[in-house]
């Protein structure tokens, strides 16, 4: 799925966040582990790598709930994303300018403490901070959570733009199925930790079961997907 936007869909408790944390190797920090199967990144098994090693390989996760450093300014938050880079100040400054190009709101608020910015600006900051690591793949956990609809659309538009222009791969976990399928190339629907359906975004959007259970377009009485 390199160079694409892939959505993990499903309700609360479906296993979306756990899947992301398994990929980024943050699961071990919560005393979890992958007990079956393999996780491969360009042919390399990554289950035993540390989160820092994953970042070095270009995989960065944006956690649910934004998690900006409240006492730091927006720009200071962004620069923490470049902590592991070794390519010099000029390259980091160029990356910062690129982030500001994609997120002009952040340029305007660059000197503001993150605690005093809006939820949308904090989400943009969290994504921008991930981009400062020069990732090949970004894992986004519930990017729409707690945001006004117009801000959600703005965030997804930027994600799509980054994907198309910078060729960054996005794996996102999202409960807003309608929005996710509008911008994703393909998706997987999870229930109780299992994949119950997969396909292109167009295929999933037109599927009658998906319409009923996840897009709110059905009138059936069934209580589970399968």
What is each of the regions a protein language model found here?
Residues 1-226:
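Glycine-rich phosphate-binding loops of nucleotide-dependent enzymes
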